[in-house]
């Protein structure tokens, strides 16, 4: 019941996805051959959210893996949990997208998309009551961004009422892998605004900082970064997979976090993050978790929540703890930092409590915030986009795949609109009513005081 179908695309998406499955397998006591070796009934009670039980008693992840080149898939398959996945669910091309969004979205990706959709349909038919999809991808490359957004829009057409959650790795401000990242990211955001329900925004630089500053790793690898992401991903869905005192699912999350349909880009955080040697010197308490979780250094994307205001936020606590204490701590945060929350949404922090902590911890918490400061990410990408687009640099790679310049212009203005929407709600106060006519009409029917 309430299954989630996991889809990973491109090199980044597949590497994050692989780490995520390692974490989920460990939490549910599934060994690398797909057999259950755990010690608690709770691990099996709702294991079907992420796993399908095969006739021979093996548990098979509900995962679809796609890429336009075979490399990452091969290393996944030979990795620790490569044998748990259903072999038919690996869908890959041979050509690669060459960091070109147009190749992923219009040419190479479009050729492969039907075979991916076949696998998605097959998995969805296996579900009792599919709750939604979670997609892991990056926005800077070609496959995860171009083909990822193509798949999201196709799934949207076919399953319009299911939740669509994405874990999207944005290009980092200082660390760039590809010159054309701003193009790919802007074209992707243009799609995500329309077709995704909830986007968890991640970026490598913020993750590097956490590894470096907090976890004290001198040379963090992508494996370390992806481990951080997977901890968060597992935290977002723990309520679905384990019993809890205050449960939540993808839809409840969306209802509580999204005040306006386009503003669904969230920053995420995780606590406790401690360096490997120092765990045994701290006892974890709810106040400590809360404090670390709201700390701006803990956010997994390079936007500073102190530069904006929270429209809404959600906290998921895991472990044995008192719900009363959780509620008190959450109120405490809101009261002490009231200037960082918009006052026209009272009680805008939701908390959920799940009894089972992650492997190796007594308690932990996951934070998801809808903050107006996320516009910093979009603004930064947009500036880089404009600088190149003004000179039409690199455009021939995209127009050569049949794209039109118009599409770039549209994507650019959609992203700029998004930035100004965030800004408008950051500046809005409870008593002044401006012209919000671009929002759904009928939401504010009071006289304007401009």
UniProtKB/Swiss-Prot annotation:
Listed GO MF terms: GTP binding; GTPase activity; metal ion binding; mRNA binding; structural constituent of cytoskeleton
Gene Ontology CC annotation, any one: microtubule
Cofactor: Mg(2+)
Keywords: Cytoplasm, Cytoskeleton, GTP-binding, Magnesium, Metal-binding, Microtubule, Nucleotide-binding
Residues bound to Mg(2+): 69
GO annotation terms (biological process): microtubule-based process
Annotated region described as Disordered, given as residue ranges: 420-450
Matches recorded under PROSITE patterns: TUBULIN, TUBULIN_B_AUTOREG
InterPro entries in UniProt: Beta-tubulin_BS, Beta_tubulin, Tub_FtsZ_C, Tubulin, Tubulin/FtsZ-like_C, Tubulin/FtsZ_2-layer-sand-dom, Tubulin/FtsZ_GTPase_sf, Tubulin_C
Coarse class of the protein's main subcellular location: cytoplasm
Bias kind Acidic residues: ranges: 429-450
Record Pfam families: Tubulin (PF00091), Tubulin_C (PF03953)
Coiled-coil residue windows: none
List of residues binding GTP: 11, 69, 138, 142-144, 204, 226
Function as written in the Swiss-Prot or TrEMBL entry: Tubulin is the major constituent of microtubules, a cylinder consisting of laterally associated linear protofilaments composed of alpha- and beta-tubulin heterodimers. Microtubules grow by the addition of GTP-tubulin dimers to the microtubule end, where a stabilizing cap forms. Below the cap, tubulin dimers are in GDP-bound state, owing to GTPase activity of alpha-tubulin.
Other notes: There are nine genes coding for beta-tubulin. The sequences coded by genes 2 and 3 are identical.
Assembly mode: Dimer of alpha and beta chains. A typical microtubule is a hollow water-filled tube with an outer diameter of 25 nm and an inner diameter of 15 nM. Alpha-beta heterodimers associate head-to-tail to form protofilaments running lengthwise along the microtubule wall with the beta-tubulin subunit facing the microtubule plus end conferring a structural polarity. Microtubules usually have 13 protofilaments but different protofilament numbers can be found in some organisms and specialized cells.
Protein name according to UniProt: Tubulin beta-2 chain
Organism the protein comes from: Arabidopsis thaliana
